[in-house]
């Protein structure tokens, strides 16, 4: 029995505390709202529902002054501005999207341009032949009339196909055998003219050289070149001949064409001469004025 009584007392105490908390919370909320509006607070009620005038005092209402109201309201200048995150607008997103689309587009060469109607019109020239004019008129009359400002690529291609120059038939060599003969004759004459021009140039240079009378100067220069070449050959010939002599000399092979030993090869050792030296370097002996019989230079 004592346990049941204690439990009932505890439940009554907890319920009474809950009701007191609800009343105090409602009164505090009402007081705050009335204080902001400048209305005096009504008399308080206790837990039993009696007014506070039974206790002998009335709480004075608290009025809110303008200065206190300003102090209560926060100032916008005191608020912190958050600049860590970038401000994104729909316009900036659109620009970023357009830039991304441009980068993803495939490359197109600027040199590949379609033919414009103006260029096609300038390429078209009036035909000189009457027959071609008549044929063009008949072809164009059957086609529908289109505005020149609205020319399509198909119409441009059609105009290019229809146009035929009358001069192209005349220049075609297969059309006329006489033209082929004339062209071949023209090529031969041009070749002869070029040969004659070259001969004329050489004759003019020879005439200029003869007119200057430079033969004496040329003879002196030739003799000067021969003397220098002979001196160089003498300087190079001596050490080379000495080396060949120490190596055993020069062997010359001869094929026997007569007698018992016909067909056999016979080797003969000879001395190294100036003529061999000059021939080995590819210099003609007569150009250096060398006498092979005497083994000396000609004067």
UniProtKB/Swiss-Prot annotation:
InterPro entries: SFR1/Mei5. Residues 177-236 form a coiled coil. GO terms for molecular function: ATPase activator activity; double-stranded DNA binding; single-stranded DNA binding. Pfam families: Mei5. Residues 17-32 have a biased composition (Basic and acidic residues). Residues 1-16 have a biased composition (Polar residues). The keyword DNA damage applies. The keyword Chloroplast does not apply. It is found in: Cytoplasm; Nucleus. Interacts with swi5 and rhp51. Gene3D superfamilies: 6.10.140.1020. This is Swi5-dependent recombination DNA repair protein 1. Keywords: Chromosome partition, Coiled coil, Cytoplasm, DNA damage, DNA repair, Meiosis, Nucleus. Involved in DNA recombination repair and meiotic chromosome segregation. It comes from Schizosaccharomyces pombe (strain 972 / ATCC 24843). Belongs to the SFR1/MEI5 family. GO terms for cellular component: cytosol; mating-type region heterochromatin; nucleus; site of double-strand break; Swi5-Sfr1 complex. Residues 1-52, 132-152 are annotated as: Disordered. GO terms for biological process: chromosome segregation; DNA recombinase assembly; DNA recombination; DNA strand invasion; double-strand break repair involved in meiotic recombination; double-strand break repair via homologous recombination; meiotic DNA recombinase assembly involved in reciprocal meiotic recombination; meiotic joint molecule formation.
């Amino acid at each position: 029995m004592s346990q049941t009584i204690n439990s009932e007392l505890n439940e009554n105490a907890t319920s009474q505390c809950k009701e007191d908390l609800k009343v105090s919370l409602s009164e505090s909320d009402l007081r705050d709202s009335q204080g902001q509006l400048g209305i005096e607070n009504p008399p308080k009620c206790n837990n039993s529902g009696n007014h506070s005038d039974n206790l002998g005092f009335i709480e004075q209402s608290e009025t809110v002054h303008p200065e206190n109201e300003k102090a209560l309201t926060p100032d916008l200048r005191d608020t912190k501005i958050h600049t860590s995150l970038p401000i994104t607008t729909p316009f900036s997103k659109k620009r970023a999207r357009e830039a991304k689309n441009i980068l993803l587009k495939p490359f197109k060469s600027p040199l590949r341009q379609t033919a414009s109607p103006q260029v096609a019109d300038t390429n078209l020239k009036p035909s000189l032949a009457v027959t071609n004019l008549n044929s063009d008129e008949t072809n164009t009359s059957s086609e529908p009339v289109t505005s020149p400002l609205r020319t399509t690529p198909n119409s441009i291609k059609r105009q290019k196909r229809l146009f035929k120059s009358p001069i192209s038939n005349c220049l075609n060599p297969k059309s006329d055998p006489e033209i082929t003969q004339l062209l071949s004759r023209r090529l031969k004459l041009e070749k002869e003219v070029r040969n004659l021009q070259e001969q004329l140039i050489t004759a003019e240079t020879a005439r200029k050289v003869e007119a200057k009378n430079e033969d004496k100067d040329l003879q002196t220069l030739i003799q000067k070149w021969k003397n220098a070449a002979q001196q160089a050959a003498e300087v190079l010939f001596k050490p080379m001949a000495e080396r060949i002599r120490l190596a055993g000399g020069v062997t010359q092979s001869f094929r026997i064409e007569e007698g018992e030993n016909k067909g056999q090869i016979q080797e003969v050792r000879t001395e190294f001469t100036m003529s061999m030296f000059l021939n080995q370097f590819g210099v003609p002996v007569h150009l250096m004025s060398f006498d092979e019989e005497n083994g000396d230079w000609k004067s």
